[in-house]
């Protein structure tokens, strides 16, 4: 058998183009590769060069499960109540009695870091993970956690690098009107507003909340809005008129200013079968644009819990198991893009 020795620069270049899940399995091949996959410069290079994997994960029965591939490093010994995804990292809120703790996990590398809370608090809070877009710093060097208590009585920031909490004194008045469960886009977090007239954003660089207008004039009625992301490269907004059998999709791939997003209407689906969906509200959407298919996670507590895969030829439904300990606790679906991003400082 002939052994082929390639120049290390070429090996580095080849490996940087492989998906993160493949590299995660290769990290124990040799010590040099393992060290390379932990190198911040290689992590950044691989993140930008490799094709993004867009997986769907589900939070149900206090655990996170993969619906498309086996991520063995998802903790199965932690009761997870909330989860937020950013750059391949999962920020999880755990329940222990009436108290909660925070833990950041990279399912691809298996790294886990517990976050000590500033004070004891219960589970009535919203959480988000993001990073500052400072050109002098790498994103992995400036990850922060945002925590909003119920009623927005307290808003806190935790910096992973300094391992410290701070309280934000200036908070946007619309914060208390946001829907829990935001999405991460280019380091910032976005939520839909209760009023449905705008999107609420949090900029992790300036640590400020901002109100962002919708790309269309909102008209009340049988209208449902949902916010999601595509491979963390595009922000996705869905507007559905179930009474008319119509779904419109808007996409944003860049931020023009602090309060303006660059939206473009991607496509519209019209079909009679949409009227037959037993939908109270849409919780999450995922999209395969080339196939013009929308995967819809619906809130239908009175019937079976279903995922609806909607296309021009109708829809099909897939059932999933309810949380038997609390039938009102709906499974939470979210888009996940694996990465080698490390938890700094290493713990």
Swiss-Prot record:
Keyword Repeat included in the entry's annotation: yes
InterPro entries attached to this UniProt entry: F-box-assoc_dom_typ1, F-box-assoc_interact_dom, F-box-like_dom_sf, F-box_dom, Gal_Oxase/kelch_b-propeller, SCF_F-box_component
Repeat region (Kelch), residues: 138-187, 306-347
LRR repeats: 59-82, 152-177, 196-220, 261-285
Keyword terms, alphabetized: Kelch repeat, Leucine-rich repeat, Repeat
Xref: PROSITE patterns: FBOX
Superkingdom in the source lineage: Eukaryota
Entry protein name: F-box/LRR-repeat/kelch-repeat protein At2g27520
Residues annotated as domain F-box: 1-50
């Amino acid at each position: 058998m002939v052994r082929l020795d390639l120049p290390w620069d070429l090996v580095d270049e080849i490996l940087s183009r492989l998906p993160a899940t493949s590299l995660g399995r290769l990290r124990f091949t040799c010590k040099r590769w393992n060290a390379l996959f932990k190198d911040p410069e290689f992590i950044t290079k691989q993140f930008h060069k490799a094709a993004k994997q867009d997986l769907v994960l589900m939070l149900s029965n206090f655990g996170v499960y993969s619906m498309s591939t086996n991520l063995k490093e998802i903790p199965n010994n932690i009761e997870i109540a909330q989860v937020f995804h950013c750059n391949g990292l999962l920020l999880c809120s755990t329940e222990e009695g009436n108290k909660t703790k925070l833990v950041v996990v990279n399912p691809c590398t298996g790294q886990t870091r517990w976050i000590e809370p500033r004070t004891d608090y219960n589970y009535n809070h919203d959480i988000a993970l993001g990073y500052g877009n400072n050109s002098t710093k790498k994103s992995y060097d400036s990850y922060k956690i945002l925590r909003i208590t119920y009623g927005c009585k307290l808003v806190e920031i935790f910096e992973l690098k300094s391992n410290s909490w701070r309280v934000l004194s200036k908070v946007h008045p619309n914060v208390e009107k946001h829907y829990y469960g935001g999405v991460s886009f280019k380091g910032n977090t976005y939520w839909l507003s209760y009023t449905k007239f705008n999107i609420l954003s949090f900029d992790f660089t300036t640590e400020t909340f901002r109100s962002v207008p919708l790309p269309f004039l909102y008209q009340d009625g049988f209208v449902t809005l949902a916010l999601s992301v595509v491979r963390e490269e595009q922000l996705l907004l869905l507007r559905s008129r179930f009474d008319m059998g119509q779904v419109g999709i808007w996409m944003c791939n860049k931020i023009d200013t602090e309060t303006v997003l660059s939206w473009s209407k991607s496509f519209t689906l019209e079909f009679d079968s949409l009227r037959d969906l037993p939908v109270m509200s849409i919780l999450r959407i995922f999209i395969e644009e080339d196939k013009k298919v929308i995967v819809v996670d619906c809130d239908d507590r009175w019937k079976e819990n279903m995922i609806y895969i909607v296309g021009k030829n109708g829809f099909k439904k897939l059932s999933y198991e309810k949380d038997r300990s609390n039938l009102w606790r709906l499974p939470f679906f979210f888009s996940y893009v694996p990465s080698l991003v490390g938890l700094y400082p290493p713990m």
